[in-house]
Amino acid sequence: MSSTMLDDVDNNMMGIKSISLYELLSDVVKQGDKTRLVTAGPEQVLPDLIRHITETIPFDLFINLKNEMNDARNLVTRLNWLGKFLNDNFLQNHTFPFTILRICELCYDPFKYYKINELEKFVNALEKCCMVTSSWQVFDKTHGEKQEDDKEKDINFIKNQEDVSLMKIPWMTENNTRELAPFIREIDSIMSVNLGYDDEDEEEGFFDGDEDREMGNKSKRNVLLKDENFMVEEYYEDDCGINDDNSDNKGQNCQSDVTKNNSDDEDDDDNDDDYREDGADEDDEDDDHMGSTDDDEDDDEDRQAGESTKVQNFDKKNETPRKRKPTDLDNFEYDESPSFTNMDLTTPKKYKHTATGRFSIIESPSSSLLNAMDGSNEISSSQEEEKEDAHENHEGRSEGLLPGDELVSPSMSSSQEDKMVAIAGITYRENISSPLGKKSR
């Protein structure tokens, strides 16, 4: 093989400077053509391959940016030592190492397995492939050996070529087969004796067992054939009798169940009628009760209408409103009369919503003494007001409420059953001093 070196390396040559080496490696690696190694021989392939390993790969292909100079020099010396080992152990003996195919793969495209800065990993892998002692041999027979094999009886010429045990071992020579002949005969004699006894026992047992089984089966069949009609009739008679008895028992049970169900249904119907009658009585009582409640509601409505008219006809001598919460509505209908009593100066009262739908007055501690003193006066006045209220209620129902009427809070002398009415939506015409009166509505 010519060792022509190229100064300008083509990009498609994978960094290999020898054209002949590039073509050989591409044929071996890509196409798997091993004959190129046989035809070229170690004398032409190994020199260019060793030069590519020791010079091109460490300096032109890989770079060591992370490693120090000492590490790079160590890797280069290791590659030089591998080249010397290949030269001394294989090139001088005119043979290839048995790992030559893997060495060709690593040298043809090292970046397929390692990165550009992983020279140390590449050197480790190459050392494992090169540090061997076995040589690579191709078992190709010459023309003379083929003629001798044709003359001899070859065991490979058999009908069943798939049996690997009958294939001839290629590295076995005639001398080896002659030495193994007595040993093989002894093994065959032992195996044949053991297999012979086993086969005879199996054959005898097989025939005896089959004959006994066949005779037994025949006798059983004859017995069954003789007693077949009797056995079948007896079986079906027993089965039919059992079925008839079962059907009769089931019919009686069904009839008893039907009668029980009918009696239960009749009892249920009677209970339903009683329930309906009781329900009708309860409905009548509910209707009576509803009628009485309706009358009570009418009386309550009349009483509330009278109270509403009473609220409208009160004098404008109103007391100050109760002490309010931030969420309560304002009432600025203050009293402008010149006369003020002690009751006017007391703490405002608080109205409590009772369960009857009316408001009751909760008096403050300051006004409790004054109210106790005036209790007798209020009792007499309340009796007179009740008489007037009955007359005014009759008039208030006929007159009704005008749309422009205003609601006024009750006075301190009014009864506790007076009702407060919301003042939302009322125009404050008379209260000019009210803060809400100045606000545009």
Curated annotation (Swiss-Prot):
InterPro entries the record matches: PPP4R2
GO MF annotation terms: protein phosphatase regulator activity
Biased composition annotated in UniProt, kind: Polar residues: 249-261
Keyword hit for Phosphoprotein: yes
Residues found modified as Phosphothreonine: T347
Function statement: Regulatory subunit of the histone H2A phosphatase complex, which dephosphorylates H2AS128ph (gamma-H2A) that has been displaced from sites of DNA lesions in the double-stranded DNA break repair process. Dephosphorylation is necessary for efficient recovery from the DNA damage checkpoint.
Annotated protein name in UniProt: Serine/threonine-protein phosphatase 4 regulatory subunit 2
Organism: Saccharomyces cerevisiae (strain ATCC 204508 / S288c)
Taxonomic lineage: Eukaryota, Fungi, Dikarya, Ascomycota, Saccharomycotina
The encoding gene: PSY4
